[in-house]
């Protein structure tokens, strides 16, 4: 792990009103995620596709704390009703960019994007080794993702909470998406 890149990402992401948590392993990442969920009194949580080692720990910890966990695959007909009552979404980043503070997520299923876009709280997990320095470095993995998934590729750049300033020219967070975003970086 390059500590300088982690610090640069943290500083930039926090300047965008994102919250960064540094942890040392998957178990600690799941504990941190559940701690955030408890703080937000989340009872219903949606998750996107997550690595098996993290997903298993998260499922166990959510069950221990009485939280309902919606897991993919999602059935499109049920999505609007299901996401109406979800308080938080948990996703996995392909990588993040230290220079911009943006988290980058790849999906090939439109419904998985809802996990990051609809709940009031979004928690994203990423490995410290998946941090890159510059936006220019993002071009190659994005190009490869589109090449490998030409029919239905989605790339999302997530730079903190949703924001708008079209109401009386005042910045308001969380109007069109999450009001709070957390990036949990696993060393």
Would you name each region that the model predicts?
Residues 1-187:
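The feature marks the mature, well-folded catalytic cores of soluble enzymes
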